[in-house]
């Protein structure tokens, strides 16, 4: 009985030792959009924290100087810098305001993409519906 309890405790320690919290950040600007946008003064940041065991992602994003109100904001992927990709996670509601926070539970595939540096944050406006500012998420 004691041996089984010790074995179970050891297994829990092994699982806990593999769990990790990973932080990401992105600096968004119009020059990193694909193609680049003419939006002088538009800028933003996005940060995220991922629990690799639960696949839970907490994020926050802020922006300023856009050509108009944000109409949408998302994390996109998988894509290398300079490439476009589909939406993975919405940032805030439609017509999000800055700053905004939120969370999502990712799939294993999404975790692999994010940790490989294949996601970017993107804020859209009416003048730039494909995205006005963008930044690649990188591990901190």
Regions of interest found by a model, annotated:
Residues 1-18:
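Gram-negative bacterial Sec-dependent N-terminal signal peptides
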Residues 18-73, 77-140:
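Metal-centered catalytic cores of metalloenzymes
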